[in-house]
Amino acid sequence: MSRPQFDPSAYAAQLEDKKSRLAGLLAPFAAPAPEVFESPREHYRLRAEFRLWRETGNEKRHYAMFEQGDKHTPILIEDFPIASRRINELMPRLKAAWADPALGFKLFQVEFLTTLAGDALITLCYHRPIDDAWRQAAEKLAAELGVNLVGRSRGKRIVVGRDYVEEELSVAGRRFRYRQPEGAFTQPNGEVNQKMLGWAYEALGQRDDDLLELYCGNGNFTLPLATRVRKVLATEISKSSVNAALANLADNAVDNVSLVRLSAEELTQALNEVRPFRRLADIDLKSYAFGSVFVDPPRAGMDPDTCELARRFERILYISCNPETLAQNIAQLHDTHRISRCALFDQFPYTHHMESGVLLERR
């Protein structure tokens, strides 16, 4: 993780630059002006990862980060204003615990995961085996800090408490509860994530047909969108994300979603009847009356075959973490679909990265 340049006084200008950049990328497709969803200026990031750096000639260690492309010049961190208040509160208390050799010896990396609901999990990574002595010290530390702890060393993982955090997000007046596993992808900016969910919920609208969701992750969007349609078929390839999504569906009593562990490419093959999949044995694909598809792909965007799959749907709701590949995908779809809504979500203040969303509807 590289360190963003934190400068709240520059936030408005940087956000305007992102808005102009997104509008420029979508201009060839006659897109409407993007709706803009701002981030808090500080304490917005719910995750943080630090290396540990030892001062030359003594045993004093610091949290450290590095500029992108430079892994040899550490930036020593005492506090981290872009991270959640909970992370900033935990950082010095955890640092004091390194004095215990059971916890501090050959510790090289620390990862914090927190939620808007106040939950916290810390992962400690070691260049040595961890054992029962580590567990005993970790149990004491977890109780003192009020957190869950995970220890990692080569080939070993010890969990103290839970290996996930619990989040609560509000969409259209309803609260949704989420388990967010250690090591799995979660949206880093909780406040902006909540705004994204609300935008997607509104953009989809209330439907009497079915939704296909590709790349569903832990069910972040699945839960609120499932309340807008008759039923959902959702796909995800990561095993830990699938398990979290299934737990989240159960915890929220959402019973109109079928989740399958398939890639977007595999699902395309299944829908095209190119080949059967055992993981679809209990699902009747012909029973679905799909009107919409929701996609939240990785930075590479949708591959050409998945784009062609999306073309079949009346509505394509697309959340993107890379506006360049978003524009490439829209170029492939533009002859059959037009952009009726678009949005900029400032998930990553003080960086060039941006999250965006578009609703494409059949012409």
Curated annotation (Swiss-Prot):
It is an enzyme of class 2 (transferase). InterPro entries: MeTrfase_TrmA_AS, MeTrfase_TrmA_CS, SAM-dependent_MTases_sf, TrmA_MeTrfase, U5_MeTrfase_fam. It holds the Pfam family tRNA_U5-meth_tr. S-adenosyl-L-methionine binds at Q187, Y215, N220, E236, D296. One of its GO terms (biological process) is tRNA methylation. PROSITE patterns: SAM_MT_RNA_M5U (PS51687), TRMA_1 (PS01230), TRMA_2 (PS01231). Keywords: Methyltransferase, S-adenosyl-L-methionine, Transferase, tRNA processing. GO terms for molecular function: rRNA binding; tRNA (uracil(54)-C5)-methyltransferase activity, S-adenosyl methionine-dependent; tRNA binding. It catalyses: uridine(54) in tRNA + S-adenosyl-L-methionine = 5-methyluridine(54) in tRNA + S-adenosyl-L-homocysteine + H(+); uridine(341) in tmRNA + S-adenosyl-L-methionine = 5-methyluridine(341) in tmRNA + S-adenosyl-L-homocysteine + H(+). GO terms for cellular component: cytosol. CDD domains: AdoMet_MTases. The active site is at C321 (nucleophile), E355 (proton acceptor). It comes from the Bacteria. Its EC number is 2.1.1.-, 2.1.1.35. Dual-specificity methyltransferase that catalyzes the formation of 5-methyluridine at position 54 (m5U54) in all tRNAs, and that of position 341 (m5U341) in tmRNA (transfer-mRNA). Belongs to the class I-like SAM-binding methyltransferase superfamily. RNA M5U methyltransferase family. TrmA subfamily. This is tRNA/tmRNA (uracil-C(5))-methyltransferase.
